[in-house]
From Swiss-Prot:
Gene: hisS
A GO MF term: histidine-tRNA ligase activity
GO cellular component terms, A-Z: cytoplasm
Coiled coil: none
Name of the featured protein: Histidine--tRNA ligase
The organism of origin for this protein: Streptomyces griseus subsp. griseus (strain JCM 4626 / CBS 651.72 / NBRC 13350 / KCC S-0626 / ISP 5235)
Pfam families, alphabetized: HGTP_anticodon, tRNA-synt_His
Catalysed transformations (reactions): tRNA(His) + L-histidine + ATP = L-histidyl-tRNA(His) + AMP + diphosphate + H(+)
PROSITE patterns, per database record: AA_TRNA_LIGASE_II (PS50862)
Principal cellular location given in the protein's record: cytoplasm
Subcellular location: Cytoplasm
GO biological process terms, semicolon-separated: histidyl-tRNA aminoacylation
Lineage: Bacteria, Bacillati, Actinomycetota, Actinomycetes, Kitasatosporales
InterPro entries found in the cross-reference section: aa-tRNA-synth_II, aa-tRNA-synth_II/BPL/LPL, Anticodon-bd, Anticodon-bd_dom_sf, His-tRNA-ligase, HisRS-like_core, HisRS/HisZ, HisRS_anticodon
Xref: Gene3D superfamilies: Anticodon-binding domain, Bira Bifunctional Protein, Domain 2
EC number of the protein: 6.1.1.21
Length: 420
C-alpha cells in the first residue's frame, strides 16, 4: 500500500467500475452529438473573477467552495467549480458566435472541484457532462435540452428520476418579485448570514435546505404571480413542448438552483433513491451571463449532468449496464518461441481491430488460463512447441469450452469472422 492516499473528498476511478463511468459519459454525450452539439474542452482552472462575476459573488460556490491559487506572477486563479462560465468564455474568446449560425451548440465533459463537506453523493472532485446552446432565445431550445437529458437517462435504463421545472423571470419582472421577497424575508427569524443573503440575492434563500428555514418559507410570495406576460408565455411554451414530446415534469415554484446567472427556464433532475443529495443534474437559461463576463448580449441555455450521481442512481435502481468485454482474444504462449509467434499474432489481431491481450511474464498454463478467464475474453489462443511444429495454434471458445487447431496463417481471419 502507498504512503499516500487520494485527498479527502476525492476518489480514484479504477477498473472495473471505471467502465461504468465511461459508459454513462457516452450515453449522455451520444444524443448531444446526434443533435448538432460539438465538443469543447476548457482548462481545469480559470481567472477567479470569471466565476465571481458569472456564478455570483454571494453564492456559496464563490464565497466558500472554490479552490483558489496565486500564480508566481500574482494572478488569482481557481479550479473550475462548474462548466458553463468556462465554456461561454471560451466560445466568446474564439468568436464562435460570429463564425456561423446561432445557436452555437457545444457539449463538454470533465472534472470539477468544490470544497464541500464530503458525504454520500457529494465530493470535492466530481465529473460532469454538460451542454450549452449559446446565442438564441427560443423555448424550443430549452425543451430540446431537457428532452435530450431525459433521453440520455432513459437510454441507461433509469426510470425513477423526476424533472422539476420553474421560471425565474427576466430583468423586467424579477426585480419586482425580488423586492416583495425581501420584504417578506426580513420579518423572518433567520441567522445573520442568511440575512446578508437577503440583501444580496434573496432568491437564494428559497434554496435553503434547513428544515427550520423551509418551514418559515411556506407563505413566501410566489414568483409565478410576478412573471410578466412575456415570461409567462415563454414558460407555457416550454411546458407545452415537453408535454407534446411525452416528457413528464413537475412544476416546482421554489426551484432556483445554486447559481446566480439563471433567468426564465430553470430545471433540475432528481432521483428518489439518492436521499438528501437527490439532484443528478440540472440547468436553465442564462440570458445575461455573456454580458456579465464582458461579452455581447447572447441569450443561452444549458445543463450539466453529474456522472458520479448518475452512477449512484443506477446502483439505487439495481441497474447493471451491459458493458462489452475489454478483451475478445487472450493469447497463452507455452515456451519462448511461442511467445514470439503469438505476440506477432496478437499484434496482427490488434491491427485488424480485434481487442486482444497476452499472457505476459512467462506464466505456466494454469496461471495463464486463470488470467484468460478473468479477462473476459471470448477466445483463447494456446500454442506450444508441438503446435508450432505443425504450423497451428489451439483456439478455445471460452463459452462453449470447444477447442481445436487453426492454421497460424488463418488465425486472424478466423477470429475476425467469428467475432463478426
Amino acid at each position: 500500500m502507498s504512503t499516500f492516499q487520494a485527498p479527502k473528498g476525492t476518489y480514484d476511478l479504477t477498473p472495473p467500475r471505471s467502465a461504468t463511468f465511461l459508459a454513462v459519459r457516452e450515453a449522455i454525450a451520444a444524443p448531444l452529438r446526434d443533435s448538432g452539439y460539438g465538443y469543447i474542452e476548457t482548462p481545469g482552472f480559470e481567472n477567479v473573477e470569471l466565476f465571481a462575476r458569472g456564478v455570483g459573488e454571494s453564492t456559496d460556490i464563490v464565497t466558500k467552495e472554490m479552490y483558489t491559487l496565486t500564480t508566481k506572477g500574482g494572478s488569482q486563479l481557481a479550479l473550475r467549480p462548474e462548466g458553463t462560465a468556462s465554456v461561454l468564455r471560451a466560445a466568446l474568446e474564439a468568436n464562435l458566435h460570429k463564425a456561423g449560425n446561432l445557436p452555437v451548440k457545444l457539449w463538454y465533459s470533465g472534472s470539477y472541484y468544490r470544497y464541500e463537506r464530503p458525504q454520500a453523493g457529494r465530493y470535492r472532485h466530481f465529473s460532469q457532462v454538460g451542454a450549452e446552446a449559446i446565442g438564441t432565445e427560443d423555448p424550443v431550445l430549452d425543451a430540446e435540452l431537457i428532452i435530450l437529458a431525459d433521453q440520455a437517462y432513459r437510454s441507461l435504463g433509469l426510470r425513477r428520476f423526476r424533472i422539476l421545472l420553474n421560471s425565474l423571470g427576466d430583468k423586467e419582472c424579477r426585480p419586482v418579485y425580488r423586492e416583495a421577497l425581501q420584504t417578506f424575508l426580513r420579518d423572518l427569524d433567520l441567522d445573520e448570514e442568511t440575512r446578508r443573503r437577503i440583501e444580496i440575492n434573496p432568491l437564494r434563500v428559497l434554496d435553503d435546505k434547513r428544515a427550520d428555514v423551509r418551514k418559515q418559507l411556506t407563505d413566501a410570495p410566489k414568483l409565478r404571480d410576478y412573471l410578466c406576460d412575456a415570461c409567462k408565455a415563454y414558460h407555457e411554451e416550454v411546458r407545452a413542448l415537453l408535454t407534446t414530446a411525452g416528457v413528464a415534469f413537475e412544476d416546482d415554484e421554489k426551484l432556483v438552483r445554486g447559481l446566480d446567472y439563471y433567468t426564465r427556464t430553470t430545471f433540475e433532475f432528481v432521483h428518489d433513491g439518492l436521499g438528501a443529495q437527490s439532484a443528478v443534474g440540472g440547468g436553465g437559461r442564462y440570458d445575461g451571463l455573456s454580458e456579465m463576463i464582458g461579452g455581447p448580449e447572447l441569450p443561452s441555455v444549458g445543463w450539466a449532468l453529474g456522472v458520479d450521481r448518475t452512477v449512484l442512481a443506477l446502483e439505487a435502481e439495481g441497474i447493471e449496464l451491459d458493458l462489452p468485454s475489454t478483451t475478445s482474444v487472450y493469447a497463452v504462449p507455452l515456451g519462448e518461441e511461442a511467445r514470439r509467434v503469438l505476440f506477432g499474432v496478437v499484434t496482427e489481431l490488434r491491427r485488424a481491430g480485434v481487442a486482444a491481450d497476452f499472457a505476459f511474464g512467462g506464466r505456466g498454463l494454469k496461471g495463464a488460463m486463470k488470467s484468460a478467464n478473468r479477462s473476459g475474453a471470448r477466445y483463447t489462443l494456446v500454442a506450444g512447441e508441438r503446435d508450432l511444429a505443425e504450423g497451428v495454434v489451439q483456439l478455445k471458445d471460452m463459452e462453449s469450452g470447444e477447442q481445436g487447431p487453426v492454421a497460424l496463417a488463418e488465425v486472424a481471419a478466423e477470429l475476425t469472422k467469428r467475432l463478426g
